[in-house]
Amino acid sequence: MNSKMKFVGNWGRLGMKFNIWEDCPKVPITELLSFIVDNRGKTVPTANDGWKLIATNCVTNNTLFPVYEKVRYLTQETYETWFRAHPMPGDILFVNKGTPGRVCMVPDPVDFCIAQDMIALRADDKKIYNKYLFAVLRSREIQQQIYNTNVGDVIPHFKKQFMDQLLIPVPDRKIQEKIGNLYYQLSYKVELNKKINENLYVQAQAIKK
């Protein structure tokens, strides 16, 4: 378990007088969303360049935003006409198949599309803070809920109709913002330090040559 997940798993008493998992009302996640971007069901026609089309391998619980590994591409026309909807900045990518439950934030600007095996969750800001929801979805408790509802012996699959079984603790808004912002900032710093170290390593290798 990496440092970020340790933090999430133990945040219940982080400078607070209560535990969100024990002392807060729990609400089905579907009641906390304003929209779900779902383009699953058809195979997207691809091209040699253009808009990035990311797959589930691009979404991990170890990075704040999706990574662009083995991406495919599609034309502007396909982008404008094929999809039901597109992710917006601040949405949360949620993997349904393969390794269900992996989540990443959607960056600003958005330079990719999603189709098979994942959806994007749009938090209802009147009900829940999106960064808090993101942090909670990565928590040990919610990841276990997702694992317990997976179906499929060969390829695990979290069905969309199971979404209302994910119960999210909903504390006061100020607490949501405290947890969400802290987790987001921690994730950002970890990711930034990783990139700095990778860059230093590349420079060191170049000097040796």
Task: Explain the meaning of each model-derived region.
Residues 55-56, 73-138:
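A short beta-sheet element
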Residues 25-45, 57-89:
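Sequence-specific dsDNA recognition surfaces
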Residues 1-40, 165-209:
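Non-catalytic DNA-recognition/assembly elements of restriction-modification systems
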Residues 112-119, 151-180, 184:
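A short glycine-rich beta-alpha junction/loop motif
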Residues 130-162:
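Short, positively charged
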